[in-house]
């Protein structure tokens, strides 16, 4: 069964094959073509199709729509962009300039009738109607970061951010446009999946606005005989991603949990995102190999599914990753030594001598070893890359005491007693950066049942002395007041935390042969626990009766008349799409991945796809909270 990511790749490959079925004989000579995309199209393609794969598909040139481009005759031009006025104006300009002989127009979202008529008029005026071969609505306007993780925007993601949804002075038409943008992308997602979901969401939230609009859009499409996109033949061969049973779409509002996005983390992928700004599966790390005095250039590191080490360890605790890198390095060195030893034992100096001695077992072993050299070199490249990334993370851990922050926050969330009073930690000049202390305090404030005013003031004074900007606290305080008055479960009881225990550091990592100097870093083992998003997902998938989730809306787009009443006899859901309106993070994603792994049995295969309007790390989220806090402190300053 194809994953979401694989189905999106297939849709884009079909588009690059000029919207005809991919030939089964891959050896067939591809049709050479040019790919022209806007920034949104680029963001969709870059995490899932490499430049090498584009070349294999016949794409000789890929360029930005709004860049200066020369005329290239006799080669099909594939456009992949949103049907915005700005983009359509540029396409019409290309028509007038006669840049290409053949145009294939592929829009990420459906183009309106009026816009297509304007485009046709421009083509007629430019005399290139015969040159336009295809115009397609592609329904792929989302970004697949993993097989089971997607976001809606990367560049200009602030348009769909937590701040954009919650700011005080958003006009009604702006909010409508924002919600429509989310709905259009979710609709495209389910067209790609080939399934119509049952929708659940909390009432009186941004999630409810999305849910009602999406239900309406799905229902209208299902009952339109000519335009129904959910027929088996209207999607890719093989039916929907989810088998037999329909999935549940659980729409959640970021307001349900502000602590997790600020939480210091300990798993590899989430750490890369938190401290190195991982974006679209690409991270930039300063090149330490630069010669002395030379300016260090950031080196791009691609973290994709072809990287076996990444796929195995992205969810692992950092010390486990460091140990695994060390083991991989030792394995590589052993393989290298084996080749050298075999060559020496046979008296072989160069590659040319091998041909004269293909007579015995030793030679056969050497031939196999030499043939495996390309794989060995690729293994070495990946080891070097992950050593570079892990070293950069380790430097941050030591400089900012990230291991201690993670350990303390886990204790705060699981209501354990801290070894040192929080006030002492915040006053400690050598304990982390100002941003780290502010994150810790906000989590402490959110998780505390009652925090006396006098204690709050002392803690705030310590934060200010540490150089913290407290603007975000104005918003967090207002948010907590509203959440405490809501009928749903109190925020203070939502968090359970797992707690941690410190075990002795791996001996391999403190030996002199290690690439990593791990002294002073705690080897924390985290007790498995469910975050708020995972707890709600479990309750909804299991159809368990719960005061909070029983009140969630229940919408079924397949019903001619929309009903909101829970059916009495409900079977548990095997598959779920969990979508966070207002921004998600790798911490929640990894928690859901770990949860669903535990739920797998030999008889039942369950799947969860996690998605979010945007992907933010703690620094970015704190910035959004500060912007919202600034509006509260000086409302007249906002326009």
Swiss-Prot record:
GO-annotated biological processes: endoplasmic reticulum to Golgi vesicle-mediated transport; intracellular protein transport; post-Golgi vesicle-mediated transport; regulation of ER to Golgi vesicle-mediated transport; response to hypoxia; response to toxic substance; retrograde vesicle-mediated transport, Golgi to endoplasmic reticulum; vesicle-mediated transport
Organism of provenance: Drosophila melanogaster (Fruit fly)
Signal peptide: none
Main localization, broad class: cytoplasm
Protein's membrane topology: Peripheral membrane protein
Region feature (4 X approximate repeats): 85-500
Molecular function (Gene Ontology), one example: SNARE binding
GO CC, alphabetical: cis-Golgi network; Golgi membrane; Golgi-associated vesicle
Keyword Isomerase: no
Localization: Cytoplasm; Membrane
UniProt tissue specificity: In embryos, from stage 14, expression is seen in posterior midgut, esophagus and salivary glands. No expression is seen in larval imaginal disks.
Family matches, as Pfam families: Sec1
UniProtKB keywords: Cytoplasm, Membrane, Repeat
SUPFAM superfamilies named among the record's database cross-references: Sec1/munc18-like (SM) proteins
Function field: Non-vital for development.
Keyword Membrane assigned: yes
Lineage: Eukaryota, Metazoa, Ecdysozoa, Arthropoda, Hexapoda
InterPro entries: Sec-1-like_dom1, Sec-1-like_dom3a, Sec1-like, Sec1-like_dom2, Sec1-like_sf
Per-repeat ranges for Sequence: 85-121, 203-245, 423-460, 464-500
Family label: Belongs to the STXBP/unc-18/SEC1 family.
Gene name linked to the record: Slh
Identification of the protein by name: Protein sly1 homolog
């Amino acid at each position: 069964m194809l994953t979401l990511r694989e189905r999106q790749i297939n849709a884009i490959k079909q588009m690059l094959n000029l919207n005809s079925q991919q030939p089964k004989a891959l050896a067939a000579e591809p049709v050479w073509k040019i790919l022209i995309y806007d920034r949104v199209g680029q963001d969709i393609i870059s995490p899932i199709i490499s430049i090498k794969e584009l070349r294999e598909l016949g794409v000789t040139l890929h360029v930005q729509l709004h860049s200066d481009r020369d005329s290239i005759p006799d080669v099909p031009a594939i456009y992949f962009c949103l049907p915005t006025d700005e983009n359509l104006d540029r396409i019409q300009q290309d028509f007038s300039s006669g840049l290409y002989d053949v145009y294939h127009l592929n829009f990420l979202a459906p183009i309106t009738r009026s816009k297509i008529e304007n485009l046709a008029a421009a083509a007629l005026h430019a005399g290139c109607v015969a040159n336009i071969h295809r115009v397609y609505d592609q329904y792929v306007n989302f970004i697949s970061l993993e097989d089971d993780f997607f976001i809606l925007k990367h560049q200009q993601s602030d348009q769909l951010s937590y701040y954009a949804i919650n700011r005080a002075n958003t006009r009604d038409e702006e909010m409508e446009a924002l919600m429509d943008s989310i709905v259009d992308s979710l609709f495209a997602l389910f067209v790609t999946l080939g399934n119509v979901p049952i929708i659940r969401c909390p009432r009186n939230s941004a999630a409810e606005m999305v849910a009602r609009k999406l239900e309406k859009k799905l229902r209208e499409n299902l009952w339109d005989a000519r335009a129904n996109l959910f027929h088996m033949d209207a999607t890719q061969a093989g039916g929907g991603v989810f088998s037999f049973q329909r999935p549940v779409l659980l729409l959640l509002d970021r307001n349900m949990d502000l602590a997790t996005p600020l939480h210091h983390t300990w798993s590899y992928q989430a750490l890369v995102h938190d401290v190195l700004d991982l974006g679209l599966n690409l991270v930039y790390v300063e090149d330490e190999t630069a010669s002395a005095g030379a300016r260090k250039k950031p080196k791009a590191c691609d973290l994709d599914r072809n990287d076996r080490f990444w796929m195995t360890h992205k969810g692992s605790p950092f010390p486990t990753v460091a140990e695994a890198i060390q083991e991989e390095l030792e394995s590589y060195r052993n393989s290298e030594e084996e080749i050298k030893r075999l060559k020496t034992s046979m008296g072989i100096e160069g590659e040319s001598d091998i041909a004269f001695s293909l007579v015995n077992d030793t030679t056969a072993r050497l031939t196999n070893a030499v043939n495996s050299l390309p794989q060995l070199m690729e293994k070495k490249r990946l080891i070097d890359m992950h050593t570079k990334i892990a070293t950069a993370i380790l430097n941050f851990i030591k400089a900012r005491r990230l291991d201690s922050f993670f350990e303390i926050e886990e204790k705060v969330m699981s209501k354990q007693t801290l070894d040192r009073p929080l006030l002492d930690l915040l006053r400690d000049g050598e304990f982390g950066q100002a941003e780290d202390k502010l994150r810790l305090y906000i989590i402490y404030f959110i998780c505390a049942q009652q925090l006396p005013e006098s204690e709050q003031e002392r803690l705030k004074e310590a934060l200010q002395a540490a150089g913290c900007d407290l603007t975000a606290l104005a918003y967090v305080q207002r948010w907590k007041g509203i959440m405490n008055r809501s009928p749903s479960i109190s925020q203070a009881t939502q968090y359970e935390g797992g707690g941690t225990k410190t075990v002795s550091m791996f001996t391999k990592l403190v030996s002199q042969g290690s690439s990593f100097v791990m002294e002073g870093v705690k080897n924390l083992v985290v007790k498995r626990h469910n975050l708020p998003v995972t707890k709600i997902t479990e309750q909804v998938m299991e159809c368990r009766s719960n005061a909070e989730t029983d009140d969630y809306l229940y919408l079924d787009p397949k019903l001619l008349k929309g009903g909101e009443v829970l059916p009495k006899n409900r079977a548990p859901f095997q598959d779920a799409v969990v979508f966070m309106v207002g921004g998600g993070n790798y911490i929640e994603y990894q928690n859901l991945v770990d949860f669903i792994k535990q739920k797998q049995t030999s008889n039942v295969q369950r799947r969860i796809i996690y998605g979010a309007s945007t992907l933010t790390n703690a620094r970015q989220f704190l910035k959004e909270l500060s912007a919202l806090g600034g509006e509260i402190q000086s409302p007249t300053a906002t326009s």
